[in-house]
A protein has these predicted regions:
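Active-site-adjacent beta->alpha loops and helix N-cap segments on the catalytic face
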Residues: 2, 40-56, 69-74, 91-105, ...
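Conserved beta-strand positions in the central sheet of alpha/beta enzyme cores
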Residues: 15, 35-37, 61, 81, ...
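Structural motif
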Residues: 30-31, 83-84, 103, 128-129, ...
Length: 152
């Protein structure tokens, strides 16, 4: 698989997360942003949102859990693959990450690390679905994030 997503993250680890059209417009105009996480939209608008990002030369990652009108089943990943030019998906659901990998999309497993049980769940899911990246939230946990980095 092409490694441009990994290269983009390595070159500039600051990733823009857009939640509305105003954020999208600003993000697309910034040259130093290479990867964009799409955290909004609906089944009718996601194609155009992704296209704006792609037209600005950036990597487009769709958070499929946050797109209105789409289900939480694996078919949502097929929909994104078939109907947009998205480079990959973000999800909190391991089954969707697994489907994204099957479709040769880049994947980010988003995880809320709230306690030791959640930490163990990350270990299990990471081994089962092998996402390209794991996004740990909340992002104010440097020691725990360091541990997650070492295990992956």
């Amino acid at each position: 698989m092409n490694s441009f997503f990994h290269e983009a993250v390595e070159e500039n680890p600051i990733i823009a997360a857009v939640k509305n059209m105003d954020d999208l417009k600003i993000c697309c105009s910034l040259e130093d942003i290479r990867v964009v996480f799409i955290l909004f939209g609906d089944v009718c608008s996601i194609r155009e949102i992704v296209q704006q990002i792609k037209d600005s030369g950036k990597v487009a990652m769709v958070h499929v859990d946050l797109i209105s009108g789409l289900s939480s089943k694996e078919i949502v990943v097929d929909f994104i693959r078939k109907n947009t030019e998205a480079d990959g998906i973000i999800s909190t659901k391991a089954a969707l990450i697994k489907r994204g990998k099957e479709l040769k999309m880049f994947t980010v497993l988003r995880y809320f690390l709230l306690d030791s049980m959640a930490y163990e769940n990350i270990r299990q899911q990471q081994h089962a679905v092998k996402p390209d990246y794991i996004e740990v939230l909340p992002g104010v946990m440097p020691k725990v994030i360091g541990k997650v980095c070492k295990m992956s």
